[in-house]
Each structure stands twice: as C-alpha cells, then as structure tokens.
C-alpha cells in the first residue's frame, strides 16, 4: 500500500510519508534511498546542506522508477539566499540530483538577520513559472516570517517543514497553517529517537502490535502532518512505512500528545542565522 496523498494549496499533492536523509552520510544515502523506494516510498527529502543530493539522485535514477513516480524535495541553504544566488543554487542542486525539475523546493531557514527570504521566494516563484519547480515552500518559518513572506509576495507557501514531535507539537503554528492553507511537514518526527523507549509510546505501540516508531508516525499522520522519518537501516526503513493498516484511538492520540513539554531539539528559527 502506498502512502496517502496530502493535497497542497497549489493543486498538487505530496505523499504523506517520505524518507528524510538529514545526517545520512553520503556513503549511506544511496543504499538508504534505494531501500526506501524498494519498500514503497515515493517521497524523498534532501537538502543542499546535507551533502548527499548526488547520492539521492543516483538512487532514484537506478531504481527503475520513472522520475514522475518519485516526489523529490530539496532545500536552499542559508548562504545562497537572494534572488540571483537562489537561481544559481537551484541549478547546482538539480545538477547534483541529476533531474530537470523538483516537486518541491524549500527555503531551509528564514535567516532573519539577512532579511533575504522574500527575494529568495520571488526567485522560487520564477522557477515555478518556468516549470522547474512544481511546488514552492519553506522550512522552519515562524508566524512572523510567514506573514512577511505572504504580505510581500502575495504567495502562500505550499508547505512549511518544521521541527515537530510529541514534545514540541507546534499547536499554534499548525493552527495558523490550517487557516492559511499551508501543509505542515514534520522534521525530527520521532524526537531524534528520544521518544522510542518512552513507556507511554511503547504502551500505545504494543497495544496495536506495532513499534514505537510506527506509533509516532501514525500520531503524525492522524494530526494531518506530512512526516519524513530518517533511517539508514533497511529493516527500519521498511518498518517505518508499515503504518497504513492501523489507527490510533482518541485516547492513544491524547496519551502521546500529553508528552508535550516544549523541548526543541534543533535551533530556534527566530535566532538561527548561521550561513556557513
């Protein structure tokens, strides 16, 4: 069974479960992406900053699948923001990936200190008009960044990919996304592994005969989130995709949601201005 599709505000759709390759070493990436595609994944999420676009693209090319069957996402790094720099960075990314278009291109971080994300998004819009990108979105944007972006460009991003897990469920931001028609995508959906041994999570998982990771992925799905768990282990990659044959109860959902404590595992987008 394939992943359900989430409709985007531009008329396109994205598979709800994909493989993320953040912190996947280049030497492991090709094998991980190949395992994911063999297991049925049709959505792969990389970024220029990950250093593994080339290996991601090679795995897709060698999979036997048509390019149109794989939803491919990459991200523009902070040092490449700005209109002209973005156009050049895009060409470099698709060259490394070995493709001629992207399904989704994201601004990796707002980098508020540089104040270039509006010009960057205007370049994204041009690339979309030119048929090089199907959907354009952002990552790690807070409400204030989204408002400036939309007010300045008149374009609502299709997706905002944010740190999101039971410890940091991002309720207010998800509510804003719903109001604006932005799809919510979760990075570090398993809390970087910190939740996999939590008795609340393992209890819910065991009641369904599932793993803790599967229960967490299902929690995201039932909230409506797009989710991109990361693994280099072929068995775990396959297991993380085996999440379409069960459903968490309202009590299960509430139990996992009760773990919220506001813990942020990654940088704060309001102050993260790193461009190295």
Swiss-Prot record:
GO terms for molecular function: aldo-keto reductase (NADPH) activity. Keywords: NADP, Oxidoreductase. The active site is at residue 50. PROSITE patterns: ALDOKETO_REDUCTASE_2, ALDOKETO_REDUCTASE_3. NADPH binds at residues 190, 228, 230-232, 236, 239-240. It comes from the Bacteria. Residues 257-276 are annotated as: Disordered. Its EC number is 1.1.1.-. PANTHER family: 2,5-DIKETO-D-GLUCONIC ACID REDUCTASE, NADP-DEPENDENT OXIDOREDUCTASE DOMAIN-CONTAINING PROTEIN. Belongs to the aldo/keto reductase family. This is Aldo-keto reductase Mkms_1985.
